[in-house]
C-alpha cells in the first residue's frame, strides 16, 4: 500500500514545487500534475506530486494519518473519530458520487 502525504506549495521552480506538510519541507517533481501555484495542495509520494487535491481533502488525509500514527504508537485511539464522513456511513448515492460510478445499484 502506498501512502501519499498532503503538502502545500510554498514556492515554484521549473518542473518542481517546494512544498510543506506534516512538519517537513520537500522539493517535489510536478511533472505528473503540471504547473502549480503557490498555495496549491498536492498529494506527494516518493518526492513526486501524484495528484492535485483541495484543502478539505488535504485535511481529511492529514486527520487519517494522525489516527494511523496514534495507533502505531500504541496510543489509545479507541475514541478517535475522523473529521470527515467515513464511506461506511454514506448512502449509496453518495458512494456512487465518491467512486464516480453512474450506477449505485451494485453497492
Swiss-Prot record:
UniProt keyword terms in alphabetical order: Plasmid
Coiled-coil residues: none
InterPro entries, per the entry: Hydgase_assmbl_chp_CS (IPR019812), Hydrogenase_HupF/HypC (IPR001109)
GO molecular function, one term: carbon dioxide binding
Pfam families the UniProt entry points to: HupF_HypC
GO biological process, one term: protein maturation
SUPFAM superfamilies on file: HupF/HypC-like
Signal peptide: none
Note: Possibly a metalloprotein.
Family: Belongs to the HupF/HypC family.
PANTHER family: HYDROGENASE MATURATION FACTOR HYBG
Protein name: Hydrogenase expression/formation protein HoxL
Species whose genome carries this gene: Cupriavidus necator (strain ATCC 17699 / DSM 428 / KCTC 22496 / NCIMB 10442 / H16 / Stanier 337)
Name of the encoding gene: hoxL
Amino acid at each position: 500500500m502506498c501512502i501519499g502525504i498532503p503538502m502545500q506549495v510554498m514556492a515554484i521552480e521549473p518542473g518542481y514545487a517546494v512544498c510543506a506538510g506534516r512538519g517537513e519541507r520537500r522539493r517535489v517533481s510536478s511533472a505528473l500534475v503540471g504547473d502549480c501555484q503557490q498555495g496549491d495542495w498536492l498529494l506527494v509520494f516518493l518526492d513526486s506530486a501524484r495528484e492535485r487535491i483541495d484543502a478539505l481533502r488535504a485535511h481529511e488525509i492529514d486527520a487519517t494519518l494522525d489516527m494511523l500514527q496514534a495507533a502505531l504508537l500504541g496510543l489509545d485511539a479507541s475514541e478517535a473519530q475522523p473529521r470527515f464522513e467515513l464511506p461506511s456511513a454514506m448512502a449509496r448515492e453518495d458512494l456512487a458520487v465518491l467512486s464516480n460510478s453512474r450506477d449505485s445499484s451494485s453497492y
